[in-house]
C-alpha cells in the first residue's frame, strides 16, 4: 500500500481495465505504478462575522496514476482534521482567534470529508494507469463552508493546513 501526502492550504481571503484488480494491486505493491494528486485551495475570501448566511467555496483534488499497463487502480482520499484536531468542527486560525469551518464531499454540505473515523468519510474511486499520457485525471470537488455569525472574529488572515492522504493499492 502506498501513501502520498500533499497539503491543501485553506485561506480565509482551502478504463482500460486489461487485467484483474489483483494484478493492479501486485504492480503497485512492487512499485511499478505511481499516483499523484494536484490540489486547488478552498479560498473563502472576505468574511463578515455579522452576516447570517454561510460563506461557501470549492477546491479540487485531481488524481492520476502512471505505470506500465492500462490497469484500474482503486484508491481512497482522506483529509486530516487540521489545527482543530476534530472533524466535527475544523478551525482556521489568526493568532489566538479562530473561525469554524468544514470540508465536505458533497455540494449539499452533509458529508464531512475526513479519514473515515467519527463523523467523517473518505472518498474513493479508481483511476486507470496512464501509460501514454492520454487518460484524464479523476477530479473530486472539495466543498468548504464557513458558518455565518461568528462574532468573535477579528480582522486578519485566517488559515489552516489540511493533510491529504492518497492511498492506492
Q: Predicted regions: what is each one?
A:
Residues 10-19:
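Bacterial N-terminal signal peptides
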Residues 1-11:
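Bacterial N-terminal signal peptides that target proteins for export
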Residues 25-96, 129-169:
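N-terminal small/polar-rich segments of proteins
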Residues 27-31, 109-114:
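Acidic Ser/Thr/Pro-rich low-complexity disordered segments
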Residues 110-133:
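Extended, solvent-exposed segments with strong compositional bias
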Residues 21-23:
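N-terminal signal peptide c-region/cleavage motif recognized by signal peptidases
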Residues 78-82, 102-106, 114-116:
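Predominantly extracellular/luminal cell-surface or secreted proteins
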